[in-house]
């Protein structure tokens, strides 16, 4: 028996003001799009904006439903839109921001497990890692070079083929 471990590095910026202009603009767009999220139950609004390899932007927001399991996270809304409107176009960078109407929104929040799996398969399908920018409405920003770092033992299409 042997023990193994996973480790990954990510960058921490104290403010979006410290980011390169391109990343700062993407974070600001993600923060802005939280305004149109539909989150009447949790009041936890999430916005995501992706920069495609073509230079185009795609956005998504969380969409809650009174039947809680039916809701949709911002990341999956974004990826479904990108996949539909820009089939097989890789995503360079995805910025995700949240606005907690009931409290602070200054610490970056990570994606949920379902979204990690969804993003992982999108990376696999387009054969390109997706950079992630994670933030609240202000405060620190986390930058990950590839979203796959968040799901080191991912399940993918190869697992279905035996």
Regions inferred by a protein language model and the residue ranges of each:
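C-terminal binding/interaction regions
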Residues: 1-36, 80, 86-162
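Short beta-strand scaffold segments in enzyme catalytic cores
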Residues: 45-52
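Short capping/connector residues at structural and topological boundaries
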Residues: 46, 63, 73, 155-156, ...
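Helix-adjacent hinge/juxtasegments
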Residues: 55-94
């Amino acid at each position: 028996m042997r023990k193994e471990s996973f480790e990954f590095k990510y960058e921490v910026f104290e403010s979006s003001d410290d980011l390169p202009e391109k990343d700062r603009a993407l974070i600001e767009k993600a923060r802005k799009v939280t305004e149109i999220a539909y989150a009447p139950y949790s009041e936890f609004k999430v916005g995501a904006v992706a920069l495609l390899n073509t230079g185009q932007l795609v956005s998504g927001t969380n969409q809650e439903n009174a039947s809680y399991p039916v809701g949709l996270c911002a990341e999956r809304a974004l990826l479904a839109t990108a996949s539909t409107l820009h089939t097989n176009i890789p995503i360079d960078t995805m910025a995700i921001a949240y606005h907690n109407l009931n409290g602070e929104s200054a610490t970056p929040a990570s994606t949920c497990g379902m979204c990690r799996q969804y993003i992982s398969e999108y990376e696999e399908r387009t054969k390109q890692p997706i950079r992630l920018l994670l933030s609240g409405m202000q405060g620190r920003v986390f930058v990950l070079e590839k979203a796959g770092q968040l799901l080191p033992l991912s399940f993918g299409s190869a697992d279905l083929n035996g």
